[in-house]
Amino acid sequence: VQALTDQSPHVRRIAAGVLTKFTHAENIAPLLSLYSKADEKDSHLRYTALLGVRNNLRDNKEIKKVLGIKWNEEQLAILAKVMLDVPSAETADFVLNYIKNHEMPRQQLIHSFEYAGRYLPSSRVDDAITLISQQFEKDKDVQFMLYNTIRQGIAQKGAKPSPRMQQWGIGLTKYFIENISEAGDVWKSRPLDSTGEPVD
């Protein structure tokens, strides 16, 4: 771990690479620090640092320790991004809590909801639905995409959709049926000519 602060970037890269293979909760903070302090031009070092964070987070024995640590805002922001590559109910719960209390760019927000919806424990799905409905109140297309992601996640776990989830799906379906566009190719009903082909 001490080698992460060595003056030589080469030594720091090697040290970070080693910590990707030997996982421990105490490795996370120095790896986050290494990433934050690395020159933006040193993409290899920054990537290796994030890879180390991800691999340490993927260790089920260490994840609860990591989630119990009080992180500062900069560390939380990095963790929330890296966790999107960690298939875990615990980290999905962490990401949902981060979304609830922090602003983030729209595309990152969508990716974060996609991730959380896929891995969240069933007990938190309704919380995710509430947040999604608030964040994307006027964007039903995004809501529908996230609805499908969550639905697939529930099915993969062998669970059943909650009443709130069912209500959300019914509401979205009703919205799209009531707002079918005349220009839409999927839903548009066009007259047929004598051959049975649609008339343009």
Regions found by a protein language model. Name each.
Residues 1-200:
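Long, ordered, helix-rich scaffold segments
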